[in-house]
Amino acid sequence: MKQERSSGGYSGIPPTSKCLVCEHPDGGSAHFGSTSCLACAAFFRRTVSLNIQFQCKKDKNCVIFHELRMICRACRFDKCVKAGMRRECVQKRRSNKKIPKKHMNMLREDQIKMEYDECKFECSGDQTDDNSPLSIEKKSPPGLLPNDSPMMADFKFDPSDIPSTSGGSTQRLERSPSPKLAESKILSMNGEELLRFYVDQLKNSMDRRRMIFTDTALLAVIDDRGDVPFDATEPPPHSLKRQYESQRFDNLLAFDFCKCCPGFDFLSRVEKAIFFRSCSLAYCLLDIAWITVQAYPEEAAEPVLMYTDGSVCTVNNLSYGWDDEEDICAHDKKKLFLGFLGRFNDAICRPIRNLKMTHVEFAALKALCIWKLGYCEFTPSMKVIGKEHEEALLNGLHNYYDDLYGNPDETGMRIGNLILLMGTVFEMNQLIMETYKSAELFELFKLDALSKSLLTL
């Protein structure tokens, strides 16, 4: 096994064969400024990079020993710190490997074609891989299987859905995947790195919103906070005029995300536009749910929604955030949005709140929705790239849950709930698209030029 190289370089630690954390007798080596085994080093790196917060269920003085089957993760992390491991030695996510443009088209065509052939080979018959991170059915408890949701039928990859191009593809050879072919990957990062990328993107978007929409912009610069920036004590009332500006900023956030998203460089111009629309919907719709739940951890008797600019409106009545505006009256706003907002609060915000979803889980849910909810519009090459994102994200989630819970049943239940929630998000996406198309058709309120373009895709 290749030994992990310490991120902090040579630290002057005398060589020893004993891990200072779990006391393993022959696994000690230099890691993050201390001496530990590879398992404890990986645990520390994952905990720091994903910013996981553990809580001890006892007296914060649990025994940490390598022969114990169950080890308190909170006390294990504390012991890592006491042993001398330093957070600053954990490297941030490496940037995605850049490929010279002169090789981009050739690499894109060959790798995506090979991945598609491999996927076609794997989908034939009823073969399943027990080790695959997509084998959620084997890990989820009864009642939480993805197939139980009618919406999830739209997310299955069936190669027969891809139209035949016999006139232009007769020279493409059908071949079974070789071991070399099976290792072909478009992404240059593993599941944990990809999950960390999406978590970083979520934090960056919140810091940018703090810069634009709050009076505490400097905190985003000096603290690198990444939390929801809005104050729920005296929020401003929502208006469509404010929404016009916040939607433009959400589109800018989606643009920044697309430009650095792994695999985006492989897409054609039309594919990039389709993918951007999925990102724009996620940065608007899903972020509203996350911001609302973080601002209001407990649902009030009169629930409200907080938008991506920090403004709020009531959900069950017109008491706040439903005033008449220059372009539209409160009655028309009620007909357009009140029913949708009530459904959105019940179907999206409430489950996120009840699940006590962490920022890592929400980042994974958002990423899965981006790559899966537009699946019926995706080209074969987009489906291949999306498949790799999905596999890597689920793999990263498994590792995250293993560290957080250490319980396979809890892991299966959490992942099953995330997958089931995707079907509801798909429904909300369709409803809001229909609402905006109606508004554009009848000129009910002002839409920015980019949003109008996305509606015509």
Swiss-Prot record:
Signal sequence, renumbered to the chain: none
Location of region: Disordered: 125-182
InterPro entries: HNF4-like_DBD, NHR-like_dom_sf, Nucl_hrmn_rcpt_lig-bd, Znf_hrmn_rcpt, Znf_NHR/GATA
Gene name of the record: nhr-20
Stated family: Belongs to the nuclear hormone receptor family.
CDD domains for the chain: NR_DBD_HNF4A (cd06960), NR_LBD (cd06157)
Residue spans, zinc finger NR C4-type: 19-40, 56-80
Species of provenance: Caenorhabditis elegans
SMART domains in UniProt: HOLI, ZnF_C4
Highest taxon of source: Eukaryota
Statement: the UniProt record of this protein carries the keyword Transport: no
Record-level Gene Ontology MF annotations: DNA-binding transcription factor activity; RNA polymerase II cis-regulatory region sequence-specific DNA binding; zinc ion binding
Location of the DNA-binding region in this protein: 16-92
Protein name per the record: Nuclear hormone receptor family member nhr-20
Residues in NR LBD domain copies: 201-457
Lineage per the UniProt record: Eukaryota, Metazoa, Ecdysozoa, Nematoda, Chromadorea
